[in-house]
Design a protein with these regions (language model features):
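A short SAM/SAH-binding and catalytic strip from SAM-dependent methyltransferases
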Residues: 245-262
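Short glycine-centered segments of the SAM/dcSAM-binding site in methyltransferase folds
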Residues: 181, 277-281
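Short conserved AdoMet
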Residues: 43, 175, 200-201, 275
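C-terminal alpha-helical "lid/dimerization" subdomain adjacent to the S-adenosyl-L-methionine
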Residues: 281-326
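Conserved Class I S-adenosyl-L-methionine-dependent methyltransferase catalytic core
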Residues: 4-8, 13-59, 63-181, 341
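Class I SAM-dependent methyltransferase SAM/SAH-binding core
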Residues: 181-183, 188-241
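Core SAM-dependent methyltransferase catalytic element
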Residues: 328-350
Length: 350
């Protein structure tokens, strides 16, 4: 070996740990630059300096401070950076724009707002076993959303962007050809139901969610095709009390929001209202079993459930226990192979 050859040594353990911990800084700088609308400005108008963004396109910031934040983002690959101080769009920044077909803008912006506040209580959640939304926001998370319509609307948009791959998975992996009616429990704005009604002309669909969300959903979703609108309904209600009759119930990122007792109650409601030889289809993470260290994002999502609400992500064994307790048995588990270990857990009556 040439004596001049440099052998790259792995970073020391403390450097690796510090890099991990700095992930909080990464999240915050990307989220806040997105809230300042920089990705949209660059997509629409092309490369420019921080000063130009402020002077010509209404970005509210101090030039030097914005430039420093943009340089940090450029080093992460979010933007390009020239020697003359101009920043440009990339494929990554496009995902942070409002009109991107894979937009995560609202989700990323939410992470910089109230979500960030609640996460400061993680240590207390670990110590006490209690969710920390009340301590950080003054009320429980779901009550906070009800009391803040704009936050609820943003949350709905965030969940839409967060569930695009899940929605695609349901459309591709689940067959509704012989189904008559599907209820999307906790269905938010109704994007999944509408997509199903577009694909299956003989299907009827219901979105069940909290009453406070229904007018927001109807405002945000305009269905101009009478062939679809005539088969679509929105119902405001309490899923823990009852669910509308149907032969298929879909719950996309719903079960992980709740403790085992409430999940079993919800699944039993579906069991009792289910018509014919129906199905329940849950879309959520399936955690790796103990001893398997794979699936970091899903395990971080599990911590997110812990600090916010009384929910959690579950292993295959835990999913089976929930279904069995509610009168179902797991028929299939189909992995969507995304970062969060999301799977479609389909159950039938025992």
């Amino acid at each position: 070996m040439d004596s001049a050859t440099t052998i790259k040594q792995p970073p020391p353990p403390e450097a690796v740990v510090i890099q991990m911990v700095m992930g909080a800084w990464v999240s915050k700088v990307i989220s806040d630059v997105t809230r300042l609308n920089v990705p949209d400005v660059l997509k629409q108008h092309g490369s420019m300096s921080a000063a130009e963004m402020i002077a010509r396109h209404g970005v509210e910031a101090r030039p030097e401070c914005l430039e420093r934040a943009l340089r940090a983002c450029a080093s992460l690959g979010i933007f390009t950076e020239s020697a003359t101080g101009e920043f440009g769009p990339t494929k990554l920044s496009d995902a942070l724009t409002m009109d991107s077909p894979v937009s995560v803008k609202k989700l990323v912006e939410s992470l910089a707002g109230s979500w960030w506040k609640v996460w400061t209580g993680l240590c207390d959640a670990i110590r006490t076993g209690e969710p920390q939304a009340r301590n950080q926001l003054g009320m429980e998370w779901w009550d906070y959303l009800k009391a803040n319509p704009k936050e609820m609307e943003d949350f709905g948009e965030a969940m839409k962007s967060n569930s695009l791959s899940s929605m695609k998975g349901v459309l591709e992996k689940c067959d509704f050809t012989n189904s008559k009616k599907v209820v999307d429990v906790g269905g938010g704005f109704g994007h999944l139901i509408i997509a199903l009604l577009e694909k299956y002309s003989g299907l009827r669909g219901t979105v069940l969610d909290v009453p406070e969300l229904i007018p927001i959903a109807k405002k945000n979703i305009q269905v101009n095709d009478p062939g679809i609108s005539s088969r679509l309904e929105y119902i405001g209600g309490d899923m823990f009390k009852s669910v509308p009759p149907a032969d298929v119930y879909v719950m996309k990122h719903i079960i992980h929001d709740w403790d085992d007792g409430r999940c079993i109650r919800l699944l039993r409601n579906c069991h009792q209202s289910m018509t014919g030889d129906g199905r329940v289809i849950c879309v959520d993470a399936v955690l790796a079993p103990m001893g398997d260290t794979a699936g970091t994002p899903a395990k971080l999502l599990d911590c997110n459930m812990m600090v916010f609400i009384s929910g959690k992500e579950r292993t295959k064994v835990q999913w089976d226990e929930l279904y069995q307790a509610a009168g179902f048995q797991i028929h299939t588990i189909t992995s969507l192979r995304d970062n969060f270990g999301t799977s479609i857990i389909e159950g039938v009556k025992k």
